[in-house]
Amino acid sequence: MSTGRWRAVPLAVRCVVAVAVLVFAYGTGVHVVQLLLPQFGPQLALPGWLTVYFASLTLWDPLAAVLLAARRVEGLVLGCVVLATDAAANGYATYVLDPASGVTPGRIGQAVITALAVGFVAFTPWLAPWFIGSGGRSGTTAQTPRRS
């Protein structure tokens, strides 16, 4: 992320995006493992729609990572949607479907995903000016950031 399309982008922005790309890559790995090896998946009987949603993350997580790495504003939007819906889906599975009480690994994981979602949504307005806009010419930034 230090050459090419990222050359003029501040180091802080590159670091935040790199962490986000790693989060989505990790999420991809987790969801692929859970899909291929069910013994590592949730130990609950999930409704069909929730199972389909979690399986779909094997597509949406890597797509968000690729779009973010390519500096596409669509990656920011998709990243926000994926993390927010993943936090909500895990919240439903953890607090509605799981009869366990107290602190559980599922609740810790759900809290982490929620924190990531809140953080990514909060950083998005700061990151957006450095991303390539979807409207207009390819290769142009959404707006020219002002140096202060």
For each predicted feature, which ranges?
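Topology signature of small-to-medium multi-pass alpha-helical membrane proteins
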Residues: 1-148
